Swiss-Prot record:
<dbReference type="InterPro" id="IPR001412">
    <property type="entry name" value="aa-tRNA-synth_I_CS"/>
</dbReference>
<feature type="short sequence motif" description="'HIGH' region">
    <location>
        <begin position="42"/>
        <end position="52"/>
    </location>
</feature>
<dbReference type="Pfam" id="PF08264">
    <property type="entry name" value="Anticodon_1"/>
</dbReference>
<protein>
    <recommendedName>
        <fullName>Leucine--tRNA ligase</fullName>
        <ecNumber>6.1.1.4</ecNumber>
    </recommendedName>
</protein>
<dbReference type="GO" id="GO:0005524">
    <property type="term" value="F:ATP binding"/>
</dbReference>
<keyword id="KW-0963">Cytoplasm</keyword>
<dbReference type="GO" id="GO:0004823">
    <property type="term" value="F:leucine-tRNA ligase activity"/>
</dbReference>
<dbReference type="GO" id="GO:0006429">
    <property type="term" value="P:leucyl-tRNA aminoacylation"/>
</dbReference>
<dbReference type="InterPro" id="IPR013155">
    <property type="entry name" value="M/V/L/I-tRNA-synth_anticd-bd"/>
</dbReference>
<keyword id="KW-0067">ATP-binding</keyword>
<dbReference type="Pfam" id="PF00133">
    <property type="entry name" value="tRNA-synt_1"/>
</dbReference>
<keyword id="KW-0648">Protein biosynthesis</keyword>
<dbReference type="GO" id="GO:0005829">
    <property type="term" value="C:cytosol"/>
</dbReference>
<feature type="short sequence motif" description="'KMSKS' region">
    <location>
        <begin position="622"/>
        <end position="626"/>
    </location>
</feature>
<dbReference type="InterPro" id="IPR025709">
    <property type="entry name" value="Leu_tRNA-synth_edit"/>
</dbReference>
<dbReference type="InterPro" id="IPR002300">
    <property type="entry name" value="aa-tRNA-synth_Ia"/>
</dbReference>
<keyword id="KW-0547">Nucleotide-binding</keyword>
Amino acid sequence: MQEQYNPAEVEAQAQQYWEEHQSFNVIEDPGKEKFYCLAMFPYPSGKLHMGHVRNYTITDVIARYQRMQGKNVLHPMGWDAFGLPAENAALKHNTAPAKWTYSNTDHMRNQLKQLGFGFDWSRELTTCKPEYYQWEQWFFTRLYEKGLVYKKMSTVNWDPIDQTVLANEQVIDGRGWRSGALVERKEIPQWFIKITDYAEELLNDLDKLPNWPEQVKTMQRNWIGKSRGLEMRFDLQSPVGEFTSFDIYTTRPDTLMGVTYVSLAAEHPIAKYLADSNPALAQFIADCKVQSVAEADMATMEKKGMDTGIKALHPITGEPVAVWVANYVLMDYGSGAVMAVPAHDQRDYEFAQKYHLGITQVIAPQNGETIDLSQAAFTDKGVLVNSGEYDGLDFNAAFDAIASTLEMANKGRVKTNYRLRDWGVSRQRYWGAPIPMFNLPEGGEIPVPAHKLPILLPEEVVMNGVQSPIKADPEWKKDELDGQYVERETDTFDTFMESSWYYARYTCPNFTDGMINKAAADYWLPVDQYVGGIEHAILHLLYSRFFHKLMRDEGLVSGDEPFERLLCQGMVNAESFFIKSEGKENWIEPENVVIERDDKGRFIAAKHKITGDAVEFGGVIKMSKSKANGVDPESVINQYGADTVRLFTMFAAPPEQSLEWSDSGVEGASRFLRRLWKAVEGHINAGTPGKLDAASLPQQQKDLRRKTHETIQKVSDDYGRRQTFNTAIAAVMELLNETSKLSDRANPQGLAVEREALEAAILLLAPIVPHITQALWIELGNSGIPLNQPWPTLDESALVRSTIEVVVQVNGKLRGKIDAAVDAPKELLEQIAVQQENVQKFLEGVTVRKVIVVPNKLVNIVAN
């Protein structure tokens, strides 16, 4: 056996073996229990980062462990390849998005192989290829035929100079990222899928997911946002054009008697009508259109409004109330109109304070406390006051009474509402799957028939950064159907479409007769283990659940949910440093910083390695390009090997917690692997083991054997139930320490016990460090590779102890430890304990008052 561990050589050999034997390619096997393990597939940005490495290492470890459990494991990989970054990169590098994307997938595939991930590459998917997106196009036409797809006017970010639609991330401080023009909110026709038809099922089925993090389920519940409220009609005092009333939805009808004004969204039809004859209002509405509609921004921005001059009538009292247009009311929630109760809603309160509008208290705390409305709104539920016949009612009673009054007057009804909006899938970009609809010359549109699919996206294009090449090319739009001229839709799909069903296509990636091969899908689905970041908790995971239900209702898949168990891995963090210049933070790569630390390793001061300038500590934050604190996985692999990177990422923290990158931690992982190598080398050089005779072992060998099987027991639980791989690694490290203490290695029995311990350690570590364990397994003379071995089996008899360690205390403080026979009598334990030299030291000159003995655990001598 080679004396020194050479990671590059060991890893190349293992990877070559897996490639030649197609070790990870699988097919359906009805006679075998399946396990489908999946990591969220990456966007092919060009290079793997440490976040990718952590995600895919976790998934690979789980997949390999399940393989060793004897299961038929599907562990695929592919590329979420459409999207705006490819367009931006193509412009920057003067190339076509397709060429840039395919070049990146080639490079990243090699990086993934270099890390030893056991993917079934025969199932590789690339979502920008027609053989993938053609089925998405087909499915969209089916949804259209079922009435689940519709087109409506929708507001977008419009760049008036570039004459194009901008994604939210392309709007920087209200201006277009490229032109610098003030961005407008503009209405254009867009395609939507009716996710709201499935809102109730999406909400209820979260209860079918016991193995999902509660945090993710809560986020989805809040996003779906089911609420019970009252929809009511406010009549206008005088008609406004064709409008005689408008509807309002509220979840707090108990506050209705405190309404002092109502607010309309800038896009409300009544506001638009009034703006035609009111230039000041038209200007205010135009200003609203350039503001952000992101919830976080809406919450903190200044509340602004304009009195329209018209009045609405309170639905119960008939009193006239002012109608305002306000920038904090959104058209796409409820009805685009809200009743304003400044005393009991903070946004309404701030607005009323600014514009000197009435504030009427109608809710009082249930405990009779007084409230100070000069400071803030009282937003809790309570008891009604100043509300006429409803005074004294609590929230529930008031809800029912007011609902009853309005229903009898035909002015309102109880309604369940959802915060969830229908999914807008149109994007006015080029690099996406074309939406399969034809526009007819006489108006209207029809779905592209199956025989004309796929609608191909041209890949050889020139990007000008302004308009989508397919929108700019009049020839691309032209098509014919049954001899009639039609025009293709030039919008493309939201890229969340591709990632909403890829998990199902992995079960049959080369199936040409349809979107999904149901037999294959029924064998493999649901995904048993899904791994990905919590940032995908809402959109991707909600859309995937929705798509699964759509595919189920089309007869393509079975079951209600796509992912059985979800693990959201934590972020990879690292130290960050910057130099402040002209109020701006210029981030510095850690390798260019000289750091002074205290004896506990904490930061004291730092300076730039080259310039000597003082450098500030930016904290331990998420690795990112913008903060210059990323670590290139390739450089670490080149220095230490892939197994070291894998071991460190699994050992540094439990998978769902943040991991702090540490060079010394990486060095420690490398050191452990070298120790493991040396332990096996030393064992081989010591001679040939005999056949293990467990019944006749001396005590030290029994102890090592017990440690081996305790480790198997613990590590099996850590891998399977707990998924705490860091503690599994720690347990194997302990086992290796115990193995190194074995003094009797000269006889075949001693070597047999050591062999059992080393082979167990190798198999237990094999999912985490697959290259070195494969090399060591073969060096020990075993046939096959660890991946194909059964998981180590626990020998319960080896756990039985003849002796046990008992702690000895004097007055509750640890003063010694003794080895005693299991279940030794109390008197014997007491006798042995007081004879310990260190214990006697603490008993000099004192009187023993009593001795407390806990069998098999502890002796505590109480003395004074």
